[in-house]
Amino acid sequence: MAQQYKFVFTAEQAASEGVTDHKKLPKLIRKARNLVKAPSKVGAVGRASSGRFYLGVNVEFKGLLPHFSIHAEQFLIANLALNSEPKLTHLAVSDNGTVFQDPCYDCTRFLKEINNAHQIEILIKNAHGRDGSFKSLESHMPDEFGSESILSAEPSLLLMERDNCLALIDEDSAAGGISSNADLCSFLKLEALKAANKSYAPYRKCPSGVALFCEGEVYAGWYIETVDRTISLGPVQAALVDFIARGEGKGFDKITGAVLVEKKDAKVGQEDTARKLLEKIAAPNCDFKVFHCQEERKDWITGAVLVEKKDAKEGQEGKLLEKIAAPNCDFKVSHCDEELKDWIKL
């Protein structure tokens, strides 16, 4: 059963399928499309810098508007993030297994957020082409659509390791549990918080994470946004990517518990969207809870001492504490020297 629902291939496993390099990506597209349960079957195959290969599929939710759906490329990006892959090098997308086209506008926005976007190569192949050719993502979308000019000089972009330094708000810590199971609720809450701390939300500063519970397993995902405020992947959708990739074909109606962690006054709240989606697809008795978080405060630091050499070439006395510590933090600097050893005699 696990092999039937395989979304990640090591280099050795891919080679056994005939995929020995990025030029052979089409050989995995059939497997990706076979995993699609939606009427329109779009598959995506990507090669990561680790040498592993990842699959993505489009996911549609019956009875919900298209903006709830997950594009194959978005699924692939979330799959990379869930597996801590730092870079995507090559990508192939097809809705029929023969023609390979550029990603759609929305998905290109997501791809441009990846830290090595300028290095990503896209397979282009028409119905009559034998092998097709790869072209850079940069040639598909001009520089003005990138995120480099929006973020700081040293941006932390999508797929790079993140820690949003979020902590649960005390008043939420004692909130009611899922199905009267306080231990399960606490565990899901912590898993959702972990996900929120990995959330990619550099523009609107509204990180969030979701943890889903199904038959003893927990699946998690986090909010991913783009510079375009109308294009993002919700935390429930990201958690569903984890569920689909690791759930070995389980139906969404088996999900019996869910926890969302987000900032209390987030500019982009996820609760309404998450609730609507889960009410439509999860088990009728699925218990959905929301907990709030905030950035951890550092202003409890009221005193600090630095010890360093007096004439150190690279002194450590800086202004970091002024930014994070209490306004009245007492900061002292003491100097040291190497101890003389020439008094030691045999």
Curated annotation (Swiss-Prot):
Residues bound to Zn(2+): H71, C104, C107
InterPro entries listed in its UniProt record: APOBEC/CMP_deaminase_Zn-bd (IPR016192), CMP_dCMP_dom (IPR002125), Cyd/dCyd_deaminase_Zn-bd (IPR013171), Cyt/Deoxycyt_deaminase (IPR050202), Cyt_deam_dimer (IPR006263), Cytidine_deaminase-like (IPR016193)
Cofactor(s) for this UniProt protein: Zn(2+)
Pfam families cross-referenced by the UniProt entry: dCMP_cyt_deam_2 (PF08211)
Active-site residues from the entry: E73 (proton donor)
Cofactor binding, per record: Binds 1 zinc ion per subunit.
Binding site for substrate: N58, V59, E60
MF term (GO), any: zinc ion binding
Record field: catalytic activity: cytidine + H2O + H(+) = uridine + NH4(+); 2'-deoxycytidine + H2O + H(+) = 2'-deoxyuridine + NH4(+)
Any one of the GO CC terms: cytoplasm
Function, as annotated: This enzyme scavenges exogenous and endogenous cytidine and 2'-deoxycytidine for UMP synthesis.
Database matches in PANTHER family: CYTIDINE DEAMINASE
Protein name per Swiss-Prot or TrEMBL: Cytidine deaminase 5
Natural source organism: Arabidopsis thaliana
